[in-house]
Amino acid sequence: MRLAEVVRNTSETQIRVKINLDGSGQQKLATGVPFLDHMLDQIARHGLIDLDIEAHGDTHIDDHHTVEDVGITLGQAIAKAVGDKKGIRRYGHSYVPLDEALSRVVIDFSGRPGLEFHVPFTRARIGTFDVDLSIEFFRGFVNHAGVTLHIDNLRGLNAHHQMETVFKAFGRALRMATELDERAAGQIPSTKGSL
């Protein structure tokens, strides 16, 4: 099993992330940001990754630091669990619909952080959740997981549906990229010999 635990403590947040990449989608989520918990649940269930995330942050100011730092810590945990990347598929992609919304996510465990985020949300908030925080979550994730990530919402009228398709597709792409390929067991998935 590929397990990892990362703790991040700053003056703004205290976060603990435990993951099992070879899990069944079990989750225990307590970030203090209910909509973020809902989206993290999508990653766990659709990625079949067991997630245990606890966060305490300065949400009395706003949710920005908590959301961003959960992304950072999750990225660190994924990188730790993947390790040297031997035998993984490296690339993953997924299209996910939800009613009128459709999103595509493509990920590469290249070791080169990069984010292309193209989601034209139809409103600025989903309940109390500022949709701009989703890009902060993913930026924190890519910078600390060392991945290239392309996120495109291809269509959608309902911002909740747009966001949910993004997180579901992300979970599925993550699962595909981190799966072990028995035909490439013990090999680094790169012509360079390292990632």
Curated annotation (Swiss-Prot):
SUPFAM superfamilies according to UniProt: Ribosomal protein S5 domain 2-like
A GO BP entry: L-histidine biosynthetic process
Keyword annotations of the record: Amino-acid biosynthesis, Cytoplasm, Histidine biosynthesis, Lyase
One of the record's GO cellular component terms: cytoplasm
GO molecular function, one term: imidazoleglycerol-phosphate dehydratase activity
Pathway: Amino-acid biosynthesis; L-histidine biosynthesis; L-histidine from 5-phospho-alpha-D-ribose 1-diphosphate: step 6/9
Reaction(s) catalysed (UniProt annotation): D-erythro-1-(imidazol-4-yl)glycerol 3-phosphate = 3-(imidazol-4-yl)-2-oxopropyl phosphate + H2O
Official protein name in the record: Imidazoleglycerol-phosphate dehydratase
Gene this protein is translated from: hisB
